[in-house]
Amino acid sequence: AVAQNADVVIIDTAGRLHNKINLMNELTKVKRVMQKVVADAPHDVLLVLDGSTGQNAFEQAKQFTAATEVTSLAVTKLDGTAKGGVVIGISDQFQIPVKYIGIGEGIEDLQVFNKYEFVDSFFK
């Protein structure tokens, strides 16, 4: 990224399950390597949670926050029966703001999180 003069680097950790210790250790190593190049990296760590996983999302948030210091959340799959209520507890317990929600599969379905609309959706 430095050689390319890139301002933004996106690292997709798809497949890094919180219960796979070796993969989580690799994620921690990626963070350390980045900090050798840019001392205060990473600047933003977005944890994407599946809104249909329920209470398992708490453990995911705990493990990923310990490994990478998550700075914001996105919750996906809120277009089905999942309401994603667990995200309220995660945001509160770990003091991580929710930035985005996913309500479908298209790019237009990734929306900026609105807390008022989110709460209203529980009563519809």
Language-model-detected regions and their locations in the chain:
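P-loop/Walker A NTP-binding module and the surrounding RecA-like catalytic core of P-loop NTPases
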Residues: 1-124
